[in-house]
Amino acid sequence: MKFYIALALALFGISQSPADDHAVVLVYHHVSEETPALTSVTPTAFDSHLDYLQEHGFTVLPLARIIEDLREGLELPQNTVAITFDDAYRSVYTEAFPRLRKRGWPFTIFVSSEGVDRGYGDYLDWSQLRELADAGVELGNHSHTHAHLVRRLPDESETAWRQRVSADIDTAAQRLRAQTGSDSKLFAYPYGEYSQSLQAIVKEKGYFGIAQQSGALGGQSDFLALPRFPMSRSYSDLRRFATSVNSRPLPVTSVSTTGADEISFRPLKELRLTLADGDYRAQQLACYRASGAPLQLTVIRQKPLTISVAVSGKQPAGRHKINCTAPASEDAGVYFWYSHQWLIKQADGGWYRE
């Protein structure tokens, strides 16, 4: 009940806050010192994140509320953030929930239902998820099996693939509804992997697609591949955290690529972006590989600003990302951000291993 009251008071007070047209979404997995560093933040680091948000006047809202308001062109409070967790790991209940409940902050858990059904060691159980749902926590769909949904099985036709993936998403929705009463229309792609074909299935089912590439949300965002900033031990220091939560969406209006496609999943040769005007320094726009290596950028046209990013260097099998950023015109330390993801198969046409 205290969590409900605190949440209601927080939502009631936002109408008096300065308005904004964007938000940032954070994604965590484990909050623990015992789990893999790649998908974990320590409880101490998590505390520092929450303290930063509170001390710097951020408003934490439910992700579904943020998405609906942005889609409808409504204003959000200044410095709006959503907090999400993927996979429904136990530490969300034991470590994150008490801390967020104390502050009266909402959050979302994207649940892979098979792990809960089978009682996988690090997963929450249904009784804990019901308790969280009863406390106002939003439970989103993260598929049933947490499989690489973009991948077809050997000799699997497109029709068979669509049926299998559709059933996987539906099963998770049915289990969430039956066990917790949740009927969220938020779907987080397992591993953050998506393709146009998978996005089409997600759209047909009436979901918003939630990805894992970095960036802020705005009204021009792709609502079938909404970005989130991943938080892990490698990315959890406060300086990097502050850069993430203060970012803004780079106003990309069109995207085209050369080389990469979702049939062969080949290396990307060129990324071309068209951008709307905004409060960013276009002359300082830069693009980088996920490793931080800078990429060559060529201005194709000034009005509207269109750039070509040449993708050089090795591209081994796996997930790849390009981050494009530009500093804000006036606010020091604030960056407009866009991230592009693509997938590459192995040379023999097989898929990479996690």
Question: Over which residues does each language-model region extend?
Answer:
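Metal-dependent polysaccharide deacetylase catalytic core of the NodB/CE4 family, i.e.
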Residues: 21-36, 56, 76-81, 89-91, ...
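Catalytic-core region of carbohydrate-active enzymes that cleave or remodel glycosidic bonds
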Residues: 171, 176-179, 203-214
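Catalytic cores of alpha/beta
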Residues: 199
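Terminal accessory/targeting
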Residues: 1-79, 101-107, 112-124, 130, ...
